Amino acid sequence: MSDKIRIGLLGTGRIGQVHAISIDENPNAELTYTADVFVEGAKKFAGQYGGKFTNDPAEVFASGEVDAVVVASPTPTHVDLINAAIDAGVHVLCEKPIDLDITRVDALRQKANSAKTIVALGFNRRFDQQFNEIHTRVQNGEIGNLEQLTIISRDPGPAGKDYLAVSGGIFRDMTIHDFDMARFFVPEIV
């Protein structure tokens, strides 16, 4: 029996590839299952990174072969996949945003708060050294009182047409990081 965290990857698109590489490079983790409605993508990932593949995420949850899943599928699938993971007792790292309907997000938050599993969101900037330094200095009062916060973000290049169709574009997909950074630096809603 392995001491590695057994991870299922749900979604083999742009961010799924990033997660697959990270899992592959982590000596404490192994990719045991990949699921994507585009089964050829899942098959390719399984061939490249190991584990089984399927086009049905329910198979991943029923397998008993995952300790955690990374939800890297299109946004409209996130709530259902997180709910399925919680029901299966599987930990979750979900890409942002969870959903565009605040009612669904609130219901999921309540369920996640009472679950025995960890549900985390992919707000990676909170773990960036420079952002953490700013956060610490703000919290310690070294910078003073923040009265205005300007965040400028750029994507390295334009996203493809297929990606834009399911991602919601730059505003929904990337600007959410800026909102999270604003909350990270200034946790009080004004």
Regions from the language model: what does each represent?
Residues 1-49, 183:
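N-terminal Rossmann-like dinucleotide-binding module
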Residues 19, 51-111:
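Beta-loop-alpha module in the N-terminal Rossmann-like domain of NAD(P)-dependent dehydrogenases
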Residues 33, 68, 148:
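Short, Asp-centered acidic motifs that coordinate Mg2+ and/or phosphate
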Residues 42, 81, 108, 134, ...:
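Aromatic/hydrophobic pocket-lining residues that form π-stacking "cages" and hydrophobic walls in ligand
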Residues 44-51, 111-115:
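Short, conserved SAM-binding/catalytic segment
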Residues 99-159:
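A contiguous active-site-proximal alpha/beta segment in oxidoreductase catalytic domains
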Residues 159-190:
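Rossmann-like dinucleotide-binding domain that binds NAD(P)(H)
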